[in-house]
């Protein structure tokens, strides 16, 4: 019985709870059993007692005949980037290894207000800087999927703990963060759904900052409907966050009608299918999904994003610049684990050089250089001006189409032991970064299997505040694909 509970989506589990087919405690206990035996290194802090206490609260509500939220009693994982009151929050960095916040992030509080159950904090790349979830002071995360020869695969990043936990059935859904693709890319590599809303939809209060003009909370789930339910609870104006949007949040779930007749879906002519060993499989998947969308009544429209080729380099200039500023606070005095030195300068130097990982230090240096005297105009200022051109390209495209369809990642699997140049690691975000720069909502959905039986994915990008549109198109694609997790050998 317990194993069967792990196969349910949020919507299915919610309906079962209302029919009293099982209790919230039984649902949480099923995930706790699975979590205790996990070997993915997905969780860095486990909060089983808190989850059970929250589940018992939902049981009491049901016994009293109260109406419950779709998230009530649902076992949720939280990326270790979001502050959780009384529960260690580290951003998977040595510099914050002992930090226990006294307050709750708005995003997680919104979930607990809906009576969701916190299973624990999830592993990630340090300060959300990475695409493999290998830059963590707690060690790398494993993808539940295995490679063609049984080798371990990366789960993507930086929300790799979140994607691995959902795909590995250690929680029913998880919160992640998406700065340049950190929800969508790991969702793609783990064969699940990953969505980020319009920039400003979700409050950043209590979310440890990486790049403030790009950071946005997102969700990782097994179905598009579940993503809509999660974001419905998470989104909303927050007066504690100056970048929070006051735009009303509609009922995302009601937008999923599975009717796309007459919808115009844009295909970007600058995005060619990458030249690699998976090209044939990806080409077949791409063609099959385009035909399916046309059969469902959608119109495929050719569009151009002229400046998209600059998106990746300008993203790394802007994000690294903002990171160098945001991470200046971790000096051992204001924040962070202190390393003693003979002088205050020694203390600063030792604290930051010994407590930050190599990738974080690399990006701080890139950012500090881009912001330095003599380089600011050539790098940071120019990047911001080109960013405006990227946004304008999307504005022009959306005059012709309702949404845009792309691949999510240039590769469908990467071995944990595979040696990649840094440029190749950064290239894994090539399809996801443009939407982040423009602050647009986007969702990654499973779209098929490679010849090796590994997941492939597509990304749908929408207009500002039009999450309902991308949820509906994504749901149509996911209906064709079905649940890829049933192909995982241990399920």
From Swiss-Prot:
Gene Ontology cellular-component terms listed: glutamyl-tRNA(Gln) amidotransferase complex
Catalytic reaction annotation: L-glutamyl-tRNA(Gln) + L-glutamine + ATP + H2O = L-glutaminyl-tRNA(Gln) + L-glutamate + ADP + phosphate + H(+)
Enzyme active site: 79, 158, 182
Listed InterPro entries: Amidase (IPR000120), Amidase_CS (IPR020556), Amidase_dom (IPR023631), AS_sf (IPR036928), GatA (IPR004412)
Coiled-coil ranges per UniProt: none
EC identifiers of the protein: 6.3.5.7
Keywords: ATP-binding, Ligase, Nucleotide-binding, Protein biosynthesis
GO MF annotation list: ATP binding; glutaminyl-tRNA synthase (glutamine-hydrolyzing) activity
Gene Ontology biological-process entries: translation
Entries under SUPFAM superfamilies matching the protein: Amidase signature (AS) enzymes (SSF75304)
Domain of life according to the entry: Bacteria
Homology family: Belongs to the amidase family. GatA subfamily.
Biological function: Allows the formation of correctly charged Gln-tRNA(Gln) through the transamidation of misacylated Glu-tRNA(Gln) in organisms which lack glutaminyl-tRNA synthetase. The reaction takes place in the presence of glutamine and ATP through an activated gamma-phospho-Glu-tRNA(Gln).
Subunit field text: Heterotrimer of A, B and C subunits.
Record-linked PANTHER family: GLUTAMYL-TRNA(GLN) AMIDOTRANSFERASE SUBUNIT A, TRANSAMIDASE
HAMAP family: GatA
Name this polypeptide is given: Glutamyl-tRNA(Gln) amidotransferase subunit A
Native species: Anaplasma phagocytophilum (strain HZ)
């Amino acid at each position: 019985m317990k194993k069967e509970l792990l196969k349910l989506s949020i919507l299915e589990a919610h309906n079962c709870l209302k029919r009293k087919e099982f209790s919230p405690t039984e649902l949480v206990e099923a995930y706790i059993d699975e979590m205790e035996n996990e070997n993915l290194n997905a969780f860095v802090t486990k909060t089983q007692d808190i989850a059970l206490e929250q589940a018992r609260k939902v049981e009491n509500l049901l016994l009293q005949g109260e109406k419950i939220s779709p998230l009530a009693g649902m076992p949720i994982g939280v990326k270790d980037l979001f502050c959780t009151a009384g529960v260690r929050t580290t951003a998977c960095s040595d510099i914050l290894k002992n930090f226990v916040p006294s307050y709750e992030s708005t995003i997680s509080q919104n979930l607990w207000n809906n009576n969701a159950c916190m299973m624990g904090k999830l592993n990630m790349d340090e300060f959300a800087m990475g695409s493999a979830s290998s830059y963590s002071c707690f060690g790398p995360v494993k993808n539940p999927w295995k490679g063609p020869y049984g080798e371990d695969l990366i789960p993507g990043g930086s929300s790799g703990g979140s994607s691995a936990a959902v795909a590995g059935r250690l929680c029913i859904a998880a919160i992640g963060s998406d700065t340049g693709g950190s929800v969508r890319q790991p969702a793609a590599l783990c064969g699940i759904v990953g969505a980020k809303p319009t920039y400003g939809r979700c409050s950043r209060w209590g979310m440890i900052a990486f790049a403030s003009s790009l950071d946005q909370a997102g969700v990782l789930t097994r179905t598009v409907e579940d993503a809509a339910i999660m974001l419905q609870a998470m989104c909303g104006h927050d007066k504690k966050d100056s970048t929070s949007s006051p735009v009303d949040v509609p009922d995302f779930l009601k937008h999923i009608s599975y009717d796309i007749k007459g919808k115009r879906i844009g295909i970007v002519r600058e995005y060619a299918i990458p030249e690699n060993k998976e090209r044939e499989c990806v080409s077949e998947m791409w063609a099959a999904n385009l035909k399916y969308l046309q059969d469902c009544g959608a119109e495929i429209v050719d569009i151009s994003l002229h400046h998209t080729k600059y998106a990746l380099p300008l993203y790394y200039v802007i994000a690294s610049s903002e990171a160098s500023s945001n991470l200046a606070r971790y000096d051992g005095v204001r924040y962070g684990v202190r390393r003693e030195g003979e002088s205050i300068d020694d203390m600063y130097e030792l604290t930051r050089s010994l407590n930050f990982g190599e990738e974080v230090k690399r990006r701080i240096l890139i950012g500090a250089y881009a912001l330095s005297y003599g380089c600011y105009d050539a790098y940071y200022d120019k990047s911001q001006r080109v960013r405006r051109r990227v946004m304008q390209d999307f504005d022009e495209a959306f005059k012709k189409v309702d949404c845009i369809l792309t691949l999510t990642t240039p590769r469908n699997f990467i071995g944990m032991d595979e040696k990649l140049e840094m440029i190749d690691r950064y290239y894994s975000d090539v399809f996801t970064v443009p939407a982040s720069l423009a602050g647009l909502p986007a969702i990654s959905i499973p779209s098929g299997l490679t010849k090796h039986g590994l997941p492939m994915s597509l990304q749908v990008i929408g207009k500002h505040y039009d999450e309902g549109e991308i949820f509906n198109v994504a749901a149509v694609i996911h209906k064709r694909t079905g649940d890829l997790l049933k192909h995982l050998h241990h399920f």
